[in-house]
Amino acid sequence: GFYRPHTPYVAPKKYFSLYPPEQVPLPTIPQNYFETIPKLASTLKPEESAMDEMTKRRAIQAYYAAITFMDAQLGRVLDALERLQLRDQTIIVMTSDHGYHMHEHGLWQKRTLFEESARVPLLVAAPGMKGAGKSTQAIVEMIDIYPTLVDLCGFEVPENLDGISLAPILDNPDHPGKSHAITQVTRGGGKARIVMGYSVR
């Protein structure tokens, strides 16, 4: 797996140059927005709320640079698979353990139930799938990755798993998939009471 993108946002300078900070779009936040959402929905830290506009733009620039740098490394892996003639024998899964706020909702980083944090990219490339190169609107969850890999490798998927194989969707992107997905995050800890938040999509 890859560590990037992750704080600190480290990448070669050439990737930063692709995103001039003055051209980086900055999400707009309605006035008094934080008064309209539950207090537990906000993860904003004091040092984040004190950031000026250019610092925010540079933070987003650095995040974009880290993503692009990571993408280039994935390209190296794909090139190696082609060079070694292993591409047709390899299942590739690209995803993330969480989404990320870049000032959407006035927030930064992760651990909210907003779409930007709860939703993650998921790309699966597997030999023989008819839906190769296509996207789907089907609802999927991270718990589906293991049964998918088991199924694609030709093994029987254990019945006691909560996740399902995504092989039918990989073969037909119009396959309906499951009806919902559940996300949960925690708040609190230490001396504070731990509160669990849930969302259903």
Language-model region placement:
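C-terminal cap/loop subdomain of S1 sulfatases and analogous C-terminal strand-loop tails that border
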Residues: 98-104, 143-146, 151-201
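Active-site-proximal cap/lid insertion segments
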Residues: 1-139, 152-160
